[in-house]
């Protein structure tokens, strides 16, 4: 269950990945589906220019269940993390960013969200194309994959004083004001 994920845990995970960056070619993070997209997004901003794959994956059904999606998701995530770029003169990893692999689709970590609690395509990226699709072969969209534009960094200054306000037709100024008058609130994303 990933419902207890927090800003502090994202910091722990980001530090762990950053300090082991030079020891491994890529990383696979097994994660619960409820907060996987939030974690992927946080890691993508905490670890800019990481330069190596960080692939988050998980399953809708527990690994011990006969019809689990977890085995295929894990094996494919490992394959994605271990795929080298044959066209790169430095022969580095093909994927060099935080991604989610789930339900036969490779998604940018900060462009995804969970939309379905029951289906095997539970995580989606509706506003950005898939970075890759998986069938018999893994087909990457090389033109969409990010490349580092500088040194890898660890940015730990996350602020939990942020909220999202969903604007709806007919919302009164008082209702909006009430949502923005939270003690300790430092920023709001208006949708």
What are these regions (language model features)?
Residues 16-17, 39-45, 174-179:
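Short, charged beta->alpha transition segments
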Residues 24-36, 183-191:
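Short acidic, glycine-rich surface-loop motifs adjacent to enzyme active sites
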Residues 56-137:
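Internal gly/pro-rich beta-alpha loop/helix module
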Residues 1-19:
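ATP/NTP phosphate-donor binding region
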Residues 29-52:
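Short Gly/Thr/Asp-enriched flexible loops that form oxyanion-binding sites at enzyme active sites
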Residues 108-189:
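Accessory alpha-helical/coil subdomains and C-terminal extensions
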Residues 29-31, 55-58, 99-103, 166, ...:
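Short beta-strand segments
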Residues 22-26, 49-53, 93-97, 102-103, ...:
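Short coil/turn connectors at secondary-structure junctions
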């Amino acid at each position: 269950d990933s419902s207890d994920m927090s800003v502090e845990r994202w910091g722990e995970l980001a530090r762990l990945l950053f300090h082991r960056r030079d020891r491994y070619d890529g990383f696979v993070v097994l994660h619960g589906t409820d907060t996987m997209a939030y974690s992927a997004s946080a890691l993508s901003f905490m670890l800019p220019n990481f330069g190596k794959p960080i692939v988050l994956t998980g399953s809708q059904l527990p690994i011990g269940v006969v019809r689990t999606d977890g085995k295929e998701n894990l094996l494919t995530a490992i394959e994605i993390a271990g795929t080298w770029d044959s066209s790169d003169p430095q022969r580095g990893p093909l994927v060099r960013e935080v991604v989610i692999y789930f339900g036969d689709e490779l998604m940018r970590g900060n462009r995804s969200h969970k939309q379905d609690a029951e289906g095997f395509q539970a995580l989606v990226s509706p506003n950005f194309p898939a970075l890759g699709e998986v069938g018999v072969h893994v087909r990457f969209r090389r033109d969409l994959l990010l490349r580092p534009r500088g040194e890898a960094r660890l940015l730990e200054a996350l602020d939990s004083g942020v909220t999202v306000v969903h604007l709806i037709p007919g919302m009164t100024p008082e209702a909006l004001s009430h949502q923005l008058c939270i003690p300790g609130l430092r920023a709001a994303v208006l949708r």
